[in-house]
Amino acid sequence: MAKDIRVLLYYLYTPIENAEQFAADHLAFCKSIGLKGRILVADEGINGTVSGDYETTQKYMDYVHSLPGMEELWFKIDEESEQAFKKMFVRYKKEIVHLGLEDNDFDNDINPLETTGAYLSPKEFKEALLDKDTVVLDTRNDYEYDLGHFRGAIRPDIRNFREXPQWVRDNKEKFMDKRVVVYCTGGVRCEKFSGWMVREGYKDVGQLHGGIATYGKDPEVQGELWDGKMYVFDERIAVDVNHVNPTIVGKDWFDGTPCERYVNCGNPFCNRRILTSEENEDKYLRGCSHECRVHPRNRYVSKNELTQAEVIERLAAIGESLDQAATV
C-alpha cells in the first residue's frame, strides 16, 4: 500500500501574542487546506500532530515557517498509508504541557526557554542507556510505557505525567547524586520536566532531543534498545521504533499474553486504556474490572446491543455474575 500521507509531529516553546486569536486563525488556515489533526496553542508556544497528503502538509509547513518566531520549527515526519486523524482541532490552552506544579502546591511553572536539561542526540542517548551509572526516566503516562519503552528505563509508579514531580520528590534519594536522562514521545514534555529537575537541584540532567520519534528514525541507532512500540495520540495508536531487533513487551490486561492492541475500558467513567486481544475484549465485555463489566453504561454492551441474558452468559463464562460484589 502506497504511503502517500505524511504525519507531522512538532512543538515549539516561543511566546505567542494574543494566543487565543492565533489559535482561531490557525484553525481557519488548516481547514482551508484540508489538513487534519490536533494542535494546542498557548501563550508559551504551540504543540501539534497533523496529517495530510504531501501537498497539504507542505503548504502547512511553509505556512508555519512563515510565522514570526517559528522560522526554525522542527517537524518530525512519518510517511503513512492512511490519515492519522478524522477531523481538525486547534485549541487554546493555558499551557501546551501541563506539569501540574501549581496544582500540587509546588513552585511556579517551568519556562523551558530559561531552564531545561541538556539535549542528547540519539547516539548520546543510546550511550546513556548503556551506562550503568546513568538513571533513565520515562516521563510519559503509564499506558504509554506499558506498550513500549527503552530497555532499562525506570517506570515511575504513576498514572500520568502530572504525577511525575511528586514521584521524583518521594524517590529523590535513589538518584539525586546520579546523572539522570529523561525521554518522552517528541520532546515537548521533557523540556519542562528536565527543567524542573534542574531547578530541584539535580546537577546532571539530560533529555533525548526530539524524543522517541527522532530516535527511531536516526540512521545510526535505528531505534535499537527500544522494546515494544511507541504510543501515539492519533488513529495509529502504536508505531514502530526499533528497526534492528524489535520485540513485544505489551501484555494483555486479562491473561498476560503478548499484546499491542489498545482499547478504552467500556465503562465511560473509568475509560482506562488497556491492552487486550479482540477475543478477550469480547470475553470480558471490554471491562477492566467486574464493576466496569456490569456498569449500566458499558459502551461495549450497548454498541453490540447485548441483552441482559447475553451479558449474564458471558459473565458466567468467566466465573462472575451480575449481582456479585464488585472487585476493583
Swiss-Prot record:
InterPro entries: Rhodanese-like_dom, Rhodanese-like_dom_sf, Rhodanese_C, TrhO, TRHO_N. GO terms for biological process: tRNA modification. Pfam families: Rhodanese, Rhodanese_C, UPF0176_N. Its EC number is 1.14.-.-. It catalyses: uridine(34) in tRNA + AH2 + O2 = 5-hydroxyuridine(34) in tRNA + A + H2O. Gene3D superfamilies: 3.30.70.100, Rhodanese-like domain. Residues 130-224 form the Rhodanese domain. GO terms for molecular function: oxidoreductase activity, acting on paired donors, with incorporation or reduction of molecular oxygen. The active site is at residue 184. The keyword tRNA processing applies. Coiled coil: none annotated. Belongs to the TrhO family. Catalyzes oxygen-dependent 5-hydroxyuridine (ho5U) modification at position 34 in tRNAs. This is tRNA uridine(34) hydroxylase. It comes from Streptococcus pneumoniae serotype 19F (strain G54).
